[in-house]
Structure formats: structure tokens, C-alpha cells
Design a protein with these regions (language model features):
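Hot-dog-fold acyl-thioester-processing enzymes
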Residues: 1-87, 150-164
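Conserved hydrophobic positions within beta-strands
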Residues: 19, 65, 92, 106-108
Length: 164
């Protein structure tokens, strides 16, 4: 499987993750275990809430976002050379309801060499989108990726994720 290194990513590149469905039972169970507000776990109470029905917890939305990103970061086509995340800034824009489908859209906003030559910082902007185009959540993230030098490879890797 090819590896995507710091040098392989181009500013402005856009990647689309796989579609993920908000499964009602999974969403409710996540809410019961992790975020038990009535509008996440109780359909009757949620119907009387400002949301007019049960909605996904922000934590569950982040889980689906990450599932969608796996299509970009780590598939049989390519694996990104992640060393770690430095920071995330999340903004929730719209509720996610059962049976709605979403996918992640990831844009490389900027990249900079790190303090050591074996890695680089990549600034990413991600939108979690419903299929109709409504933005559920946005994420600004800065991550560290290995360089080819840091991996010990001197050859150019082929980026395998689908670019749109």
C-alpha cells in the first residue's frame, strides 16, 4: 500500500470520505452511554425540545466524521503517514437526525516544515456534510505527517486517495 507523506500533499487538494449513515439505534446507544441529554436519548422529550425530535450527540457526529475520514487516511489504496494531531477546532452548524447520511470533505489549507526534518505540519479544513449539502460540522485541524526523509525512504510515494 502506498504511503502519503508530507511532501505528497498539495495545498488546495480536496478529498471526499465515504458516506456514513446515522443509525438510529447506534446514535441512541451512544447518547445513553456518553451524552445523555433528553434530546439525544428520549424521543418523547426530544419532540418537545427546540429540535423537535431526537438528534445525534456531537460526540457521535465526530465518530461518524472520523469513520468517513478513514476512506481518505487509511485504505487499501493509500495510508497517510500520521504522527499525531496537534489541535482541532470543531464547530457544530446543524443537527444530525437518524437515517441521514453524511460524508467528510477534507481540504489541505496549508503546510509547513516542522522543527525537525522528519516531519511537517499540515493544516486541514474538514466539512461534515449531509448528502443534500447542508454542513453539520466543520473542523480545523493541524496534524503532523512524516516526511520521506523521516521514514527513511528516498523515493516519491504515490498518493492513492481520490481527489475531487
Amino acid at each position: 500500500m502506498p504511503t502519503v507523506y508530507f511532501e505528497d500533499l498539495q495545498i488546495g487538494s480536496v478529498f471526499l470520505g465515504r458516506e456514513c449513515v446515522c443509525d438510529k439505534e447506534e446514535m441512541l446507544e451512544f447518547g445513553r452511554r456518553n451524552d445523555p441529554w433528553p434530546f439525544h436519548v428520549d424521543e418523547d422529550a426530544a419532540a418537545r425540545s427546540p429540535f423537535g425530535g431526537v438528534i445525534a450527540s456531537g460526540g457521535y457526529i465526530v465518530t461518524l466524521w472520523y469513520r468517513s475520514l478513514i476512506e481518505i487516511y487509511n485504505t487499501e489504496r493509500a495510508s497517510w503517514a500520521f504522527l499525531g494531531g496537534l489541535e482541532w477546532h470543531l464547530r457544530f452548524r446543524a443537527p444530525l437526525r437518524p437515517a441521514e447520511t453524511l460524508r467528510a470533505k477534507l481540504t489541505v489549507k496549508d503546510k509547513r516544515p516542522w522543527f525537525t526534518p522528519d516531519r511537517g505540519a499540515v493544516m486541514l479544513y474538514s466539512e461534515v456534510l449531509k448528502l443534500q449539502g447542508e454542513v453539520v460540522c466543520t473542523v480545523d485541524a493541524t496534524v503532523l505527517l512524516a516526511t520521506r526523509r523521516g521514514s527513511g525512504l528516498g523515493t516519491t510515494a504515490v498518493a492513492g486517495a481520490e481527489v475531487h
